[in-house]
């Protein structure tokens, strides 16, 4: 689950991570009133959307008067802000964060993530702040420093100081930076985060360390013990299809292609998308129905896939391990009839009761194209979609 920058900064502030003072506003008039509450002559007007790259896209403005705050607020509110993370359609700006300006001496990047290679939380940092970390990794990987954290000990003070030293924070501010990083690590652990990222973290002219940004992603599987965080969820920032999918324990992520995918298991789903790409197609989604797919879940999965107007065909790729292929086949037949499917449909089944499942599909009389392998299924759906 994602939250807005201003919400992330409230969490930071409550856990001892220094941030500038700021207020959220939903109208231009409110933006001016909130700016009046700040003890500053320079204001930063920030568009609040669930996407990075806002600064480069014109979503962050520096105002030196209340009239400029109002002008920038009017400019940003209601605007479709297009960044490298939103796609070409962009996201509508519905709220702003009005923040005190900071005396920036130097910008840095810091982030905590889960490193799948070590199964540990890893602290990453770079002195190339204000730049996308992926860009730094591609062009100057030697400028990214990492500390792998022992879950029993936590982020040790010597590790925090070492990374501060490595990214060239001045020696007089290293202890402040170390304290900052330890507080940030505590946010990551106590709030069950999957990502905590600040870009930029800044060193001020007075030698203080501040978080000028706040990107926090939470582990959805841990939200049951964070009711306060659940209340921060902004459904308007999420894909309605993803929201609907979550109601049925379906993992759905929309993509830009035209071939709908329904698969069980995240690994098989990614392999299916790669195979479609390999044969010249473009997946329209990632959809994992999980290990306990029922007729109802399969039907809802079809409805969600068909909710994307770009979809021109569907590839169902199911391995029946825990699930029986005959049950899945019955669900597919019932779902196709209920949604009155007219698009090309290719189904590949393998596993428990696979022959019975294939017979059910064959006897249905529906226009379901069978496939013996994932590669064959991908080739068939790519060809059929191109003929539509």
From Swiss-Prot:
PROSITE patterns: ATP_GRASP (PS50975), SUCCINYL_COA_LIG_3 (PS01217). Transmembrane segments: none annotated. The keyword Repeat does not apply. InterPro entries: ATP-grasp (IPR011761), ATP-grasp_succ-CoA_synth-type (IPR013650), ATP_grasp_subdomain_1 (IPR013815), Succ-CoA_synthase_bsu_CS (IPR017866), SUCC_ACL_C (IPR005811), Succ_CoA_ligase-like_bsu (IPR005809), Succinyl-CoA_synth-like (IPR016102). Substrate binds at residues 264, 321-323. Its EC number is 6.2.1.5. Binds 1 Mg(2+) ion per subunit. Mg(2+) binds at residues 199, 213. ATP binds at residues 46, 53-55, 99, 102, 107. It catalyses: succinate + ATP + CoA = succinyl-CoA + ADP + phosphate; GTP + succinate + CoA = succinyl-CoA + GDP + phosphate. One of its GO terms (molecular function) is succinate-CoA ligase (ADP-forming) activity. GO terms for cellular component: cytosol; succinate-CoA ligase complex. Keywords: ATP-binding, Ligase, Magnesium, Metal-binding, Nucleotide-binding, Tricarboxylic acid cycle. It comes from the Bacteria. Its cofactor is Mg(2+). One of its GO terms (biological process) is succinyl-CoA metabolic process. It is an enzyme of class 6 (ligase). The keyword Ligase applies. Pathway: Carbohydrate metabolism; tricarboxylic acid cycle; succinate from succinyl-CoA (ligase route): step 1/1. Residues 9-244 form the ATP-grasp domain. Belongs to the succinate/malate CoA ligase beta subunit family. HAMAP family: Succ_CoA_beta (MF_00558). Succinyl-CoA synthetase functions in the citric acid cycle (TCA), coupling the hydrolysis of succinyl-CoA to the synthesis of either ATP or GTP and thus represents the only step of substrate-level phosphorylation in the TCA. The beta subunit provides nucleotide specificity of the enzyme and binds the substrate succinate, while the binding sites for coenzyme A and phosphate are found in the alpha subunit. Heterotetramer of two alpha and two beta subunits. This is Succinate--CoA ligase [ADP-forming] subunit beta. It comes from Staphylococcus carnosus (strain TM300). The gene is sucC.
């Amino acid at each position: 689950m994602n939250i807005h920058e201003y919400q992330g900064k409230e969490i930071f502030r409550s856990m001892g991570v220094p941030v500038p003072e700021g207020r959220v506003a939903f109208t231009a008039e409110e933006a001016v009133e909130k700016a009046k509450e700040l003890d500053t002559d320079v204001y930063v007007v920030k568009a609040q959307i669930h996407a990075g790259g806002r600064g480069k896209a014109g979503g962050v403005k520096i105002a030196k008067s209340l009239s400029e705050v109002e002008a920038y607020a009017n400019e940003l509110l209601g605007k479709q802000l297009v960044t490298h993370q939103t796609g070409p359609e962009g996201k509508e700006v519905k709220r702003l964060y009005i923040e005190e300006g900071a005396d920036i001496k130097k910008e840095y990047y810091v982030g905590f993530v889960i490193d799948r290679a070590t199964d540990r939380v890893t602290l990453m940092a770079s002195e190339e702040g204000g730049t996308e970390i992926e860009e730094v990794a591609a062009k100057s990987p030697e400028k990214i420093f990492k500390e792998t954290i022992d879950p029993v000990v936590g982020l040790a003070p010597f590790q925090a100081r070492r990374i501060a030293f490595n990214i060239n924070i001045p020696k007089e501010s290293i202890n402040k930076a170390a304290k900052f990083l330890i507080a940030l690590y505590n946010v990551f652990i106590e709030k069950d985060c999957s990502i905590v990222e600040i870009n930029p973290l800044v060193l001020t002219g007075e030698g203080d360390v501040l978080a000028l940004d706040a990107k926090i992603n939470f582990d959805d599987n841990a939200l049951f013990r964070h009711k306060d965080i659940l209340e921060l969820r902004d459904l308007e920032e999420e894909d309605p299809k993803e929201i609907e999918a979550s109601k049925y324990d379906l993992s759905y992520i929309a993509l830009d292609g035209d071939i709908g995918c329904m698969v069980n298991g995240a690994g098989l789903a990614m392999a299916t998308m790669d195979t479609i790409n390999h044969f010249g197609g473009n997946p329209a989604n990632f959809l994992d129905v999980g290990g306990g797919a029922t007729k109802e879940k399969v039907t809802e999965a079809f409805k969600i896939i068909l909710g994307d107007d770009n979809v021109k065909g569907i590839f169902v790729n199911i391995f029946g391990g825990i699930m029986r292929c005959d049950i899945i086949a019955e669900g597919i037949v019932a779902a196709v009839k209920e949604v009155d499917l007219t698009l090309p449909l290719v189904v590949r089944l393998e596993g428990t009761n696979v022959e019975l499942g294939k017979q059910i599909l064959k006897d249905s009389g529906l226009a379901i194209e069978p496939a013996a392998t994932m590669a064959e299924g991908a080739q068939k759906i790519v060809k059929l979609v191109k003929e539509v």
